[in-house]
Amino acid sequence: MSAMSANDSARPQSSSEEVPLLEIRDLEVSFRSHSGLVPAVRGVSLTVYPGQTVAIVGESGSGKSTTAHAIINLLPGTGQVTGGRILFAGQDLAEAPERDFVALRGRKIGLVPQDPMSNLNPVWKVGFQIEEALEANGIAKGKAAKVRAAELLEEAGLADAESRLGQYPHEFSGGMRQRALIAIGLSARPQLLIADEPTSALDVTVQRQILDHLDGLTNELGTAVLLITHDLGLAAERAEHLIVMSKGRVVEAGPALEILQRPRHPYTRKLVAAAPSLASQRRSSALARADIREHALEVVGEAEQHGEIGVEFGKATDDVVVATGLTKVFKIRHGLRKSTDFTAVDDVSFAVRRGTTTAIVGESGSGKSTVAQMVLGLLAPTSGNVVFDGKDVATLDRRETLAFRRRVQPIFQNPYGTLDPMYSIFRTVEEPLRTHKVGSKAEREARVRDLLDKVALPASVMRRFPNELSGGQRQRVAIARALALQPEMVVCDEAVSALDVLVQDQILTLLNDLQAELGLTYLFITHDLAVVRQIADDVLVMSAGAIVEKATTDEVFNSPREEYTRKLLDAIPGGSIRLGA
């Protein structure tokens, strides 16, 4: 079914709103390469009515953003519309000259792009950038533009808007930058707003605030929204109609709830199954996790019987890591002589059971990543200690530190940033083996092949470089490297937050499988409670540097004690939509 037919069937035929605001018919978009035109969007049709929110959902490379950018003639590189029609308020934009788009962009069609740091000029004050948009669209200039810019920032939910006008983008948090882009996107009161992954890089609580505010503004102004996202749960919660895209084509379209509860296409079913925001509700997620924990503990038990655990530090304990009274205070300098103390972590205590996963959950700035760095021995605590297998990490000598590095390995958020772009995949995975003088050259190569096989990558990727791999493949390489020295514990710091939901699901499944097979212990850092149900046994909820709740995963999801935990649960996109078991 095309998106157009799905939408039409759901609208009353006699309504005065029957005339669509945006109607795309059989859109074709291609990119020119050395070998000719490469199709990116194939025969896409969709309809958006005035005041309606329609979401296009799909993984990276599905063509969803390309479709959106074709509407306003902002296709990157060699992209061009090669067929079909884009009717906006009766005008065919597929045939329109550039001068028509200059008049349309901002005034009639607004855009909120994905990455606010890349889309705000770092050398211009935020106020100037909003004023520039107002002037370009003929709304206001001079003092009037400044007054209006402050009103728009306030409207977008920023407190003390007038003083914010004089700040630069780097002085804003991610959520504040996104609000500034919303202010720019809605500054000319457009009829249609294209929101391209507007919250994918933000914490779930900030995401909810931003989307709630966007909903409120667009409802008040009567603006139609075309929402681009990879998260089916978020799309179903925010949009009336969904369009599911895969490989440049629309594979399913229709009313949001209907698609979510009764998906027909195999790809849509895969998206519904993969989205952590939806899987977090399912009892099956908890049952699968219990099974993995049981397998991992069996492996740990066998290793203990054979004396393979705790060799370097002495006898193994049930708790592989015990943190007591962890506190970290940073000095914030003001000029040459003045400084103030900032407490990032405040008296945090917890234990991680061997063969299990403990998740630390909290918003940005809660202190969770600082705790992870102290557990890894990368940051010295101001007070308190981290004990690994009965030994204080801060007191390790050089030999013990090397042993600790082998036994505890990290996986970080951005796989591209943590892989050397000049190293081949083979050299990347082999490096820890070479550094720790493990095996001969031939043995190391065999080990790399085995590691790549464990993370479901073909041996052929060994000679490739990070820029030749997708985000999910790069994260698999990072996992292979972390496992090279056969660690007992892996610290995953936002290891899936930068990935599409399908790739997220694949990586979470891989981490679970590896834990069951190797008896690994995980400390999993995340801002998103949705992924916790699939990966964790115990949960620590952090806020403002302190632990506000400690419980098992089931207790957190079924009977949270703290208001802050309930707030995080409520912020899970699509969490209110019932899917059954």
Where in this protein do the model-derived segments appear?
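ABC transporter nucleotide-binding domains
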Residues: 1-281, 293-581
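Post-kinase regulatory C-tail/linker adjacent to protein kinase catalytic domains
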Residues: 287-293
